[in-house]
Curated annotation (Swiss-Prot):
It is a peripheral membrane protein. Its main location: membrane. Belongs to the complex I 49 kDa subunit family. The lineage of its organism: Bacteria, Bacillati, Cyanobacteriota, Cyanophyceae, Synechococcales. GO terms for molecular function: NAD binding; oxidoreductase activity, acting on NAD(P)H, quinone or similar compound as acceptor; quinone binding. NDH-1 shuttles electrons from an unknown electron donor, via FMN and iron-sulfur (Fe-S) centers, to quinones in the respiratory and/or the photosynthetic chain. The immediate electron acceptor for the enzyme in this species is believed to be plastoquinone. Couples the redox reaction to proton translocation, and thus conserves the redox energy in a proton gradient. Cyanobacterial NDH-1 also plays a role in inorganic carbon-concentration. One of its GO terms (biological process) is photosynthesis, light reaction. NDH-1 can be composed of about 15 different subunits; different subcomplexes with different compositions have been identified which probably have different functions. It comes from the Bacteria. This is NAD(P)H-quinone oxidoreductase subunit H.
Length: 394
């Protein structure tokens, strides 16, 4: 009896660019040997809009509304970095109150970013229930943003050179504290549902392992780096804004797998809540309604009319010129290090405006860590990286 030989040549499969678990318009050209991944080539660029070139043809005030559409889960972070770069180049001081307001917005955005990562990631690996819970919590963050900026998800257009566009509305800090009190137990609820679930743990433990040296050599940042045993957080390293005023810890794990990345993001949400609570209590001038009452009672000479109690140093004129020089400014977003290299030539628009997106760099290691895994693991590993194609393609 003759025995039929099975096919042994590799098979090439296309994932995306419109696959439901692709997290945007990413295409993966995957070479398979049976069920095993032999090679993977990411094809990017489907969402390229020329954001850097747009920046070089707009003034800063005109450009801020554009940037939140790059990464719609991290709009506030991109607004912050786009104003930080010219601010530092022109040595423009930021009032303490404005800095605290910025921190409040950034930490709310960090929680919103991690929630939008958590739901789809768990859905990718088969846990559907938390997917519906995360939108309930995000809705509360959107309500806070809508009260302060007028917009919910993107186009907040809130950050300005020297501060923010407007002070916090009356009662906003109380609502923010209410959110912190309400959200803390919800994180415990997620952990109860997921963290010690044996099916979930067997599904992702030991998957997509990245060692400490590998993470550093591939220039990873954010939870991808911290999950590999490198406690590197720009909020501690660069001392930007007023993060040094608060008591909080850098979340890190040592295993470097998908489960470690999940644990880091869960812990980061807890640390963000700690920062939010402290910022609400310590903000110079306190709630807006109290600050206004002090100013009205004490008149123009009141200490509460001083520089550090303002929400913006000085409103930026449309003719504000970015001085000669070049500078790289960076901050820690929910996905990692985002940065802007700006080159000014004493004009209202920058000569060069290079954007470093965290998920763009983090995505580069995907082919390296996919090799040897099963085809069913592709979505779990890709999901653990946390990419949004708007900022990868820019």
């Amino acid at each position: 009896m003759t025995q039929l030989e099975t096919r042994t040549e590799p098979m090439v499969v296309n994932f995306g660019p419109h696959h439901p678990s692709m997290h945007g318009v990413l295409r993966l050209v995957v070479t398979l040997d049976g069920e095993d991944v032999v090679d993977c080539e990411p094809v990017i660029g489907y969402l390229h809009r020329g954001m850097e070139k747009i920046a070089e043809n707009r003034t800063n005030v005109m450009y801020v509304p554009y940037v939140s559409r790059m990464d719609y889960a991290a709009g506030m972070f991109y607004e912050a970095i786009v104003v930080n770069a010219p601010e530092r180049l022109a040595n423009i001081p930021v009032p303490k109150r404005a800095s605290y307001i910025r921190v409040l917005m950034l930490e709310l955005n960090r929680i919103a970013n991690h929630l939008l990562w958590l739901g789809p990631f768990l859905a990718d690996v088969g846990a559907q229930t938390p997917f519906f819970y995360i939108f309930r919590e995000r809705e509360m963050i959107y309500d806070l943003w809508e009260a302060a900026t007028g917009q919910r998800l993107i186009n907040n257009n809130y950050f300005r050179i020297g501060g923010v566009a407007a002070d916090l509305p009356w009662g906003w800090l109380e609502k923010c504290k209410d959110f912190c009190d309400w959200f803390g137990p919800k994180i415990d609820e997620y952990e109860k549902l997921i963290t010690n679930n044996p099916i979930f743990r067997r599904r992702i433990e030991g998957l997509g392992v990245i060692g400490r040296e590998e993470a550093i050599n591939w220039s990873l940042s954010g939870p991808m780096l911290r999950a590999s045993g490198v406690p590197w957080d720009l909020r501690k390293v660069d001392h930007y804004e007023c993060y040094d005023d608060f008591d909080w810890d850098v979340a890190s794990e040592k295993e470097g797998d998908c489960f470690a990345r999940y644990r880091v993001r869960i812990e980061e949400m807890r640390q963000s809540l700690k920062i939010l609570r402290q910022a609400c209590d310590m903000i110079p001038g306190g709630p807006t309604e109290n600050l206004e009452a002090h100013r009205m009672a004490e008149g123009k000479d009141s200490a509460f009319a001083g520089f550090d109690y303002q929400y913006v140093a000085k409103k930026v004129a449309p003719t504000f010129k970015i001085p000669n020089g070049e500078l790289y400014s960076r901050l820690e977003s929910g996905k990692g290090e985002i940065g802007v290299f700006i080159q000014g030539n004493n004009d209202v628009t920058p000569w060069r405006f290079k954007i470093r997106a965290a998920d763009s760099n983090n995505l580069q290691i995907l082919p390296h860590i996919l090799k040897g895994h099963k085809v069913a693991d592709i979505m779990a590993i890709l999901g653990s990286i946390d990419v949004i194609m708007g900022s990868v393609d820019r």
